[in-house]
Amino acid sequence: MKGLFSISTAIMLSCASFQASSETINYYVIAKQATPFQIESPDKTHKGIVTDIVKAVFNGSKYDIDYHVYPFNRMISLLEQGGEANWITYGSPNWGGVQAENLSEMPIYNVKHSLVTSMNNTFDFNSMKDMDEKVIVLLHGFNYPQLVPYFDNGNVEELRVKDYKAAFRVIKKLPGETAFVEMQSRIKYNLSQQKLNTDAYRVQSFSSVIPDYPIYLAFDPKMDADIQAFINERLKTLKSTGKLDDIIHNYI
């Protein structure tokens, strides 16, 4: 009996030691609008470029990932209030705010923006002059300072939609009058996921208006210094071994 008690006690102490040694990383995911960077799933088998990178960073480590999925504006509001300790998501200096305060040492991806129109009554885009008296379709929650002057002076109209399906539907129904502006990677991914005929849409570079820029992992401004150093070292390893590029190519 004494031996059984000793074994049970040892097991309990071992479990307690494991729990004490593990630390939680609170990973914030944008619901619905961030594919292919973050793709949420009801069964919590989350994936996506950023999500897979985060998983790879902490794979085999003492850190556990706790997922938090919110609509974009709600997520930003929570993070501005402090969020959960040692939170992580993705961001860029170009975005400002909480997604730009504390970033990884190296970027994880370079963003390009594109303008999508219907091939039915399409038009060439060379400058914003080509958008005079037309409508630019944007997703809710995503703001582009470069476009604000054109919206403010009334030369271009702004139309917000809730998701990619709605955006593609608008430009299909109003060919020649509308264009959807979004990250090139998101456009290609969502056209494919929705099994739309890519020949029905024209994708043109929008880099002359929104210059290309890098995105990074974004951290809690108060993140534990050891955790942040660990992440940065793992990112360097993922890059040097080609794993980072492999993850990106799985989606794009």
Where do the PLM segments sit?
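Short coil/turn segments
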Residues: K32-A34, P42-K44, P93-N94, S118-T122, ...
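N-terminal signal peptide c-region/cleavage motif recognized by signal peptidases
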Residues: S14-S17
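Extracytoplasmic small-molecule ligand-binding "clamshell" domains
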Residues: S22-Q99, R160-V161
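Short helices/loops that flank or line small-molecule/ion binding pockets
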Residues: N59, N73-N86, N102-L103, Y164-K188
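Extended ligand-binding regions for polar small-molecule ligands
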Residues: T51-S61, P214-H249
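Ligand-binding cleft/hinge of the Venus flytrap
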Residues: V54-K62, M106, D130-D132, H140-Y164, ...
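Periplasmic-binding protein-like
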Residues: A31-Q33, N110-H113, L196-N232, I252
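Acidic, polar ligand-binding/catalytic clefts
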Residues: H68-D130, G141-Y144, S205-V209
